[in-house]
C-alpha cells in the first residue's frame, strides 16, 4: 500500500529564514502564498509589470516585485504560471538569478518532464502539487483542513530536497490531508492523461453526446441538460466520498442495473485502445510537441475549438437554467 505522509512527518522549521517567492498570483499562486504566509513563512510575490494581480496581492498583505527581483531575493522559487509561459519567463527572469543552494519548485511537471526547462545542477528541483483548485486549497487551509498533494524530487543538490519539499507541502496545508510521493514523469503523464481521457476531454464529449442524443430524439433540451450535465456532480460527489461501490449503494436498483448492462456498451475495448493511444502520445512527447507548437502560433486551433464549443446548444440551455437556480445566485 502506498504511504501517505502527514503533519508529524514534515518539519516546517526547515523553511525558517528562507524567503519564498511565489511566481504568479492566480488560482494556485494566491493559495500557496497566503497559506505559507499564515504558516509563518516569509513570502513575496513575483509578477510581470502591469499585472492585474498586483493590487490583489498587495491588498492581501504581500510584497510584490518583478519576477527577476523576486527570484534574486528568494531562497525558494515556486513557479505557478501557466505551462506555456514558464519556459520564456524562466530563461529571461528566473535562470539568471539562480545561485547554489536555491530551491526551484513547480506544481506540475510539464516543463521539466518534456525538457523545456533545464535547471542547473547546483539547485534543488522539487514539486508540490495540490490535488485541487487554488480556492479549495485556500478554503480548506482556513478551515483547519487541507487538500491532498503530491510531492517529488527531480534534483537533490542540497541532499535535503525531499525534506524541504515535504516542509513546503506542510506549509500549504497538504500534510493535514496527506501527501503522496511521486516523480515528475509519473505526475505529468498521469495528470495529462486524466485531463484528456477522463476529466475534461472524455467527460465533456460524453456529456455533449448524451445531451445531443436526447434532444435529437425529441426530448426537451432542459431535461436533457439535467440528466446529462447537472446530475454529474451528484454522482461524482458520491464517487469521491466512497468510490464506485458507495455510489452504487446510493443509487436506485434500476440505475445500478443500467450501470452494469449499459456502461460497457459505451466504454469498451475500443475505447480503451484509444485511451492507450492518448497515453502513448503523452509518453512519447507528441502531445507536448503539438501543444508547444500551438502556443507558439498564438493558439489558432485552440481558439477556434473554444469558440465552436461555446456555441453548443448545451451551453445556451445551461445558461438559461442556471439563471433560474436560486441556490447558484
UniProtKB/Swiss-Prot annotation:
Binding locations of Mg(2+) 1: 191, 195
Keywords, in A-Z order: Amino-acid biosynthesis, Branched-chain amino acid biosynthesis, Magnesium, Metal-binding, NADP, Oxidoreductase
InterPro entries: 6-PGluconate_DH-like_C_sf (IPR008927), KARI (IPR013023), KARI_C (IPR000506), KARI_N (IPR013116), KARI_prok (IPR014359), NAD(P)-bd_dom_sf (IPR036291)
GO molecular function: ketol-acid reductoisomerase activity; magnesium ion binding; NADP binding
GO biological process annotation, one example: isoleucine biosynthetic process
Domain KARI C-terminal knotted intervals: 183-328
Catalytic activity: (2R)-2,3-dihydroxy-3-methylbutanoate + NADP(+) = (2S)-2-acetolactate + NADPH + H(+); (2R,3R)-2,3-dihydroxy-3-methylpentanoate + NADP(+) = (S)-2-ethyl-2-hydroxy-3-oxobutanoate + NADPH + H(+)
Residue stretches making up the KARI N-terminal Rossmann domain: 2-182
SUPFAM superfamilies: 6-phosphogluconate dehydrogenase C-terminal domain-like (SSF48179), NAD(P)-binding Rossmann-fold domains (SSF51735)
Binding sites annotated in the UniProt record for Mg(2+) 2: 191, 227, 231
Residues bound to substrate: 252
Residue numbers binding NADP(+): 25-28, 51, 53, 83-86, 134
Classification via HAMAP family: IlvC
NCBIfam families according to UniProt: ilvC (TIGR00465), PRK05479.1 (NF004017), PRK13403.1 (NF009940)
Name under which the protein is recorded: Ketol-acid reductoisomerase (NADP(+))
Naturally occurring in which organism (per UniProt): Prochlorococcus marinus (strain AS9601)
Gene name of the record: ilvC
Amino acid at each position: 500500500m502506498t504511504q501517505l505522509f502527514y503533519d508529524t512527518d514534515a518539519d516546517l522549521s526547515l523553511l525558517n529564514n528562507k524567503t519564498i517567492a511565489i511566481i504568479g498570483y492566480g488560482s494556485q499562486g494566491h493559495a500557496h502564498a497566503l497559506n505559507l504566509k499564515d504558516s509563518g513563512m516569509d513570502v513575496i510575490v513575483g509578477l510581470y509589470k502591469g499585472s492585474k494581480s498586483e493590487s490583489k496581492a498587495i491588498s492581501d498583505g504581500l510584497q510584490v516585485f518583478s519576477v527577476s527581483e523576486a527570484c534574486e531575493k528568494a531562497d525558494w522559487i515556486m513557479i505557478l504560471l501557466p505551462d506555456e509561459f514558464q519556459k520564456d519567463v524562466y530563461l529571461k527572469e528566473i535562470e539568471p538569478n539562480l545561485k547554489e543552494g536555491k530551491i526551484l519548485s513547480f506544481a506540475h511537471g510539464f516543463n521539466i518532464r518534456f525538457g523545456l526547462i533545464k535547471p542547473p545542477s547546483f539547485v534543488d528541483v522539487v514539486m508540490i502539487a495540490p490535488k485541487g483548485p487554488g480556492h479549495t486549497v485556500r478554503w480548506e487551509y482556513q478551515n483547519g483542513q487541507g487538500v491532498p498533494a503530491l510531492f517529488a524530487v527531480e534534483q537533490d543538490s542540497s541532499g535535503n530536497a525531499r525534506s524541504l519539499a515535504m516542509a513546503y507541502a506542510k506549509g500549504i496545508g497538504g500534510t493535514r490531508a496527506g501527501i503522496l510521493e511521486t516523480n515528475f514523469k509519473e505526475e505529468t503523464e498521469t495528470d495529462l492523461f486524466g485531463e484528456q481521457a477522463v476529466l475534461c476531454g472524455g467527460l465533456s464529449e460524453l456529456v455533449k453526446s448524451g445531451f445531443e442524443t436526447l434532444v435529437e430524439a425529441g426530448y426537451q433540451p432542459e431535461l436533457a441538460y439535467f440528466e446529462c450535465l447537472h446530475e454529474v456532480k451528484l454522482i461524482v460527489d458520491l464517487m469521491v466520498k466512497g468510490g464506485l461501490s458507495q455510489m452504487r449503494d446510493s443509487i436506485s436498483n434500476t440505475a445500478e442495473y443500467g450501470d452494469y448492462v449499459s456502461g460497457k456498451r459505451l466504454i469498451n475495448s475500443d475505447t480503451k485502445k484509444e485511451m492507450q493511444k492518448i497515453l502513448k502520445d503523452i509518453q512519447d512527447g507528441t502531445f507536448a510537441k503539438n501543444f508547444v507548437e500551438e502556443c507558439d502560433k498564438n493558439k489558432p486551433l485552440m481558439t477556434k475549438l473554444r469558440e465552436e464549443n461555446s456555441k453548443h446548444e448545451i451551453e445556451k440551455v445551461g445558461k438559461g437554467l442556471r439563471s433560474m437556480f436560486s441556490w447558484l445566485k
